[in-house]
Amino acid sequence: MAERYQNYVNGAWTGASSGSVSTSTIPADLSDVIGEFQASTSGDVNAAISAAHDVKESWRRTSSLARGGYLLKAASYLEANTEEFAQALTRECGKAILEARGEIGRAVALLQY
């Protein structure tokens, strides 16, 4: 069974208010399901934007050193899981695996910059 992904809003995982999901498949084999994603409504999106605005002031007061630490943590996670992300890109987009690995590597480098 395909994994069902949720939205992350205001520090919590949540489904779409409609309860609906959208299924993503492999373009080369429509029977091969990648996962199910929340079919978010405009209200769901507006709630996420509102939550982001609510924490903007707190984030602004976060030191540049702490912000950099978050980016480095994200880079480390992405780098440690490069193969998983590259395989996902290859399955979903048909991208060559070497190209997908390179794309992940460039994302890691950007986060580390």
What residue spans do the PLM features occupy?
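Terminal low-complexity tails and localization/encapsulation signals of metabolic enzymes
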Residues: 1-36, 69, 73
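Glycine-rich loop-to-alpha-helix module at the N-terminal edge of alpha/beta enzyme cores
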Residues: 30-113
